[in-house]
Amino acid sequence: MTTPTTRKDLMIVNMGPQHPSMHGVLRLIVTLDGEDVVDCEPILGYLHRGMEKIAENRTIIQYLPYVTRWDYLATMFTEAITINGPEQLGNIQVPKRASYIRVIMLELSRIASHLLWLGPFMADIGAQTPFFYIFRERELIYDLFEAATGMRMMHNYFRIGGVAADLPYGWIDKCLDFCDYFLTGIAEYQKLITRNPIFLERVEGVGIIGGDEALNWGLSGPMLRASGIEWDLRKVDHYESYDEFDWQVQWQREGDSLARYLVRIGEMTESIKIIQQALEGIPGGPYENLEIRRFDRLKDPEWNDFEYRFISKKPSPTFELSKQELYVRVEAPKGELGIFLIGDQSVFPWRWKIRPPGFINLQILPQLVKRMKLADIMTILGSIDIIMGEVDR
């Protein structure tokens, strides 16, 4: 009888691209020494659709329906960045009411994105129950979106100089009711998850990123704020009307998966505070800057003539992008979503470079999982929060 020999060689395992916990079509080639991870190589590109090249052959209004397919769980942010660039290039003023509506929609979208991060993240580490709970609240947000925009997911709601339609009658009261209800929902999650000993065993001290390391890797969003860096573009860049509301930047010092969870839970509470203040203080007035429909076509336009009042309000504006370059960014749920835009005195952008937060946050994954256990890969990957639509573009 021969004695079995122990294996000394390393094992290479494929995770994905159709693995249910991969959050899209991400493929990881993992090198294992028993249960220990020796190396991990992410393979991208399965969801590449040429979004940057498409942008260079479309006007801004034609391109708006495409951008909701980057991060398809937080579509308001991709729309916001797409119209913020041309607005800054053309120095277009946004009415106060439109700015408040945008803030409300952006924060609702942030909550919906964080909820759909929380459920699968908990399922990844073995807790099935929250996965079903989060859909309860998320459906209420989608009901609000549907009432205001007509669409549950790909909203196509933002426009250059405002939004596509005003809030319908009764929407503000319905949204305030949701805010009151959702605060009790967050308290329920805190009770169910935050002090759960099994949950803490799985996430505490797993995937630690220091502050300097986070800056060197170019991380942003909850990944950066969980590492002790108090950096939020809503406070830094003063875009939309965020300066008019009282809210706090959520951050933690530890830099592990638990800290990233706590930052996102805290952000949902702060988003509710912003929404409540915006709903209670929303001013009257127009929801769209109608003057930009003319886009400098006429030197002395007649504001009250028949064509302006009845014809030129709704057609797609042929907005010429002036010959300059610009970088605009917003604080998306996953981090800094930016666009580098080069105009060429044409209706099409000459260059449209997307800076997706998920793509840059994902770069640190191989370093985080080295010398960890195989089961910790799902915890760390889940805590990064990626959507392959924006990673591959």
Swiss-Prot record:
Similarity section: Belongs to the complex I 49 kDa subunit family.
Alphabetical list of HAMAP family matching this protein: NDH1_NuoD
Cellular compartments annotated: Plastid, Chloroplast thylakoid membrane
Protein name: NAD(P)H-quinone oxidoreductase subunit H, chloroplastic
GO CC annotation, single: chloroplast thylakoid membrane
Any GO BP: photosynthesis, light reaction
Function in brief: NDH shuttles electrons from NAD(P)H:plastoquinone, via FMN and iron-sulfur (Fe-S) centers, to quinones in the photosynthetic chain and possibly in a chloroplast respiratory chain. The immediate electron acceptor for the enzyme in this species is believed to be plastoquinone. Couples the redox reaction to proton translocation, and thus conserves the redox energy in a proton gradient.
Family matches, as Pfam families: Complex1_49kDa
Keywords: Chloroplast, Membrane, NAD, NADP, Plastid, Plastoquinone, Quinone, Thylakoid, Translocase, Transport
Subunit structure: NDH is composed of at least 16 different subunits, 5 of which are encoded in the nucleus.
Membrane topology: Peripheral membrane protein
Record-level Gene Ontology MF annotations: NAD binding; oxidoreductase activity, acting on NAD(P)H, quinone or similar compound as acceptor; quinone binding
Record field: catalytic activity: a plastoquinone + NADH + (n+1) H(+)(in) = a plastoquinol + NAD(+) + n H(+)(out); a plastoquinone + NADPH + (n+1) H(+)(in) = a plastoquinol + NADP(+) + n H(+)(out)
E.C. numbers: 7.1.1.-
